Amino acid sequence: MAYDSAATRRRILTAAIAEFAAHGVAGARVDRIAENAQANKRAIYLYFGDKRALFAAVLEQQLSHIAETVPIDGDDLPGYAQRLVDYHTAHPETLRLLMWEALELGDSEVPAEAARTRHYQDKVDAVRAAEAGDDPQALVLFTLAIASYGFAMPQLRRMVLGTDYSPERLRDSIASAVRALGTK
């Protein structure tokens, strides 16, 4: 059977997502990634370079996935927020990776910062074009924050909302809050 480098690369990325989401960059171990990917460490270094470069590749993949799966609709920010809630429910690892990035890099430049900044500016432009709210930049930031905070801090969500606050109710409450923010 011929070696499938694309399949190996995918397995490495999948294993790296789980490893980095659980342990961050500093705590992640290339040995565990290789074992879980059924690959050797040499393949990781060959395809991705060092551990930080692998983390950057993981983030790029995850952020591309959320951007493709949940495009912004400047005319329907509450619906966009609900779709973000759905995404974070199905893919909690994405927020965990972003939180690890924030913890480990702080306010330093992040991988592919220029491209990521352009991506968020496109969101701001979509909100501005829809004439939603007085401050499109703040509205995008607040929408992203409201839609993700309860997933980034599940313990706080539980303490404030209790255990009987249904996911549907949370989703609807987030949409209502975003709707109120966008009201001129």
Please report, for each region that a protein language model flagged, where it lies by residue:
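Hydrophobic/aromatic residues within well-ordered alpha-helical segments
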Residues: K51, V58, Q62, H91, ...
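C-terminal peripheral helix-coil segments that are non-catalytic and often amphipathic
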Residues: D86, A90, Q121-A130, G150-K184
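Amphipathic alpha-helical linker/stalk segments
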Residues: A22, A56-R83, Y120-A126
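Amphipathic alpha-helical segments that line or abut small-molecule/effector binding pockets
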Residues: T14, G74-L103, Q137-L144, D172-R179
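Amphipathic alpha-helical segments used for helix-helix packing
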Residues: H88-A114, M153-L161
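Helix-turn-helix
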Residues: R11, A15-A53, A57
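N-terminal intrinsically disordered/low-complexity leader segments
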Residues: M1-A7
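Amphipathic alpha-helical packing segments from all-alpha helical-bundle domains
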Residues: A67, P71, G106-L141, E168, ...
